């Protein structure tokens, strides 16, 4: 598996008395550097949370007119100079959904919250600002919890969860089509029970995790995602968390965060693992 690119993770804070009790997605904010977006698993309202790097709640945003069936992942994309968030309603435990859904919203920008954590801002993303796509797997329904957007190839990738060897699926977004978009199988990966993934801001590094391990790839220049992930991964230091389903690169690529659920009375920590190569993203 090779040497470790990241050091051991340390706790940066605890989600104390927080409505985030089943964190199931994490991504670094581009509009608000030093902050992270997350959301709950199925059963919650249609909302996303902004936390700082000490796990303190800063803002809650509701998505008007959107159903939260089984939100599992959140990702980032930039188009025409605008930062967007992609919310993945991609969970399907029984693999019965004929299609899954993603919602794309302009990333909210804040200024007043930086100096105060007295109370979280609460606001709403209007329905007119939400772009929704329905997606369909080319080979039938799948359960998935891992999703990221590749800025180099302008592709959204979803990694399935429950197979003994999971699938990597891709689709180009954004698109103007109102039809259900086809998720094409790009590769089969020798992992199982994948719960989260992220890509570095420049698209050169990829992280994938399950409940026990974090895996890392360094992408070669011009390489497709399927070729990158078909190479052997390097396994990173990781202390398993209670139902750990969230991972995100820091905005400068200098490490990654993980966030877990509050499970069986255990606290949910925000962990940070530093990159052994300082500031690798140029």
Language-model features: locations:
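Sequence/structural signature of beta-propeller domains
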Residues: 2-282
């Amino acid at each position: 598996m090779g040497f470790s690119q990241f050091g051991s993770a340390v706790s940066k804070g605890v989600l104390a008395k927080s409505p985030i009790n089943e964190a199931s997605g994490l991504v670094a904010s581009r509009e608000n550097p030093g902050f992270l977006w997350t959301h709950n698993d199925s059963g919650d309202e249609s909302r996303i949370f902004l936390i700082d790097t000490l796990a303190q709640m800063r803002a809650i945003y509701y998505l008007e007119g959107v159903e939260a069936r089984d939100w599992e992942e959140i990702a980032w994309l930039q188009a025409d100079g605008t930062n967007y968030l992609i919310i993945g309603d991609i969970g399907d435990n029984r693999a019965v959904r004929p299609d899954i859904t993603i919602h794309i919203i302009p990333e909210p920008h804040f200024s007043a919250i930086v100096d105060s954590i007295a109370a979280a801002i609460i606001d709403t993303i209007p329905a007119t600002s939400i772009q929704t796509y329905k997606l369909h797997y080319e080979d039938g329904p799948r359960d998935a919890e891992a999703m990221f957007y590749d800025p180099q190839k302008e592709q959204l990738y979803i990694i399935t969860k429950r197979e003994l060897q999971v699938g990597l699926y891709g689709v180009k977004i954004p698109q103007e089509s109102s039809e259900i978009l086809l998720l094409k199988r790009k590769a089969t990966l020798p992992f199982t029970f994948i719960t989260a993934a992220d890509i570095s801001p420049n698209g050169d590094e990829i992280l994938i995790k399950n409940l026990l391990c974090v895996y890392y790839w360094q992408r070669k220049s011009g390489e497709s995602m399927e070729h990158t992930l078909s190479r052997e991964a390097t396994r990173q230091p990781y202390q398993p968390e209670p139902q750990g389903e969230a991972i995100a690169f820091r905005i400068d690529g200098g490490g990654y965060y993980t966030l877990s659920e509050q499970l069986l009375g255990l606290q949910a920590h925000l962990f940070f693992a530093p990159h052994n190569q300082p500031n690798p993203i140029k």
